[in-house]
């Protein structure tokens, strides 16, 4: 009964203490019932609906609230190719809004191959990174293939997909199937470069939930994890990625390969939509022959497509998103699954608890942390790079794509917070960098390399315990 009273009081007081940050109240001052965790401190969101990734944290009020919804609108705005407000799309592009890829601030499914074609949104929220086989980017083509273009302009290329399947078996006889997509570029715009000389790797969008907390994590804590991430008995040895962001060598935290140390709003608007801004003022296809002359279809390309103020509102929107609280934490099966999570040593990489920088610190882009600082958060990630293997089905998770210090077989540990709501928010259960895992079980069974030992511990569990571990993941 004592814990129940605390639980009721916690929910009753939550709106009050999240709005009193200036009085020095810290989430660690709140006594939380045993077995229950606030996912993101004062940014924890008590919501179990399709808007669970796309809603403001409770502290968002006043000016912050109006800016949040302004940023939300810009995030979802369908860009057009004219020069008016909301324009600037193209001339070539891979998506026409942030929300067309990150639906409800989540991830759309890999419709390029799940629907047998490019889908209604071109690559349908899949980014296709393309380089020469030596890893060099192509000048005048940005970092991704732009498979769509405004009227009168040629898209940069298209993609064909071939799926490979293989059936495996657990020791108890239950079967499971893995598949992976193989891609081939065709209709490549640059006639001087043969498609067979190109290398491509595909991404489906990451969830944007928890981006503010992620950017606010104390880097010293991640560096400490890297220093002690050495578990030879399980083959685990994580390392940090460092990249040059805004002219500063910084610890990478976001992106599939921890290749970003900052919110990538300006990069996304430029690289994915062709929307120029103060950080990326040049058109992504500036040097292409079809752009010669400086204008096309009567459009001007000598002014920025979106203002710095608008970019800052989108930044704030992403920083202020709430993180869904865990659900069903007292369910017997979920509790058993949590035990299995630790028994399989998943927690050695999917680290449960981290802390953000002290209140009064700033993000890399200069934004202060009045609401994100001094928080205890539970992202279930160490944000380190790990070798995920190249053996499963002859390819493993090695995409041969280098990003910063990350090699092709290395991936950042994916934060698991909010993962259990993906089907409700986005209507599908595709996981991993390219969506090849069609459910959480397949995502686990794709673990190789440093994840091999944990996968094998999971594989050898009785079916009841495997199912319980999945139920635990669904509670996050």
Description of each model-found segment:
Residues 2-10:
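Sec-dependent signal peptide recognition
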Residues 211-212, 225, 229-302:
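Active-site substrate-binding loop specific to GH73 endo-beta-N-acetylglucosaminidase modules
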Residues 6, 33-49, 275-293:
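Short, compositionally biased low-complexity segments
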Residues 16-19:
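C-terminal motif of bacterial Sec signal peptides marking the signal peptidase cleavage site
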Residues 29-62, 66-243, 323-433, 442-445:
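Short glycine/threonine-rich turn/loop motifs
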Residues 279-323, 333-339, 410-476:
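Extracellular low-complexity, Gly/Ser/Thr-rich intrinsically disordered linkers
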Residues 21-24:
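Bacterial signal peptide processing site
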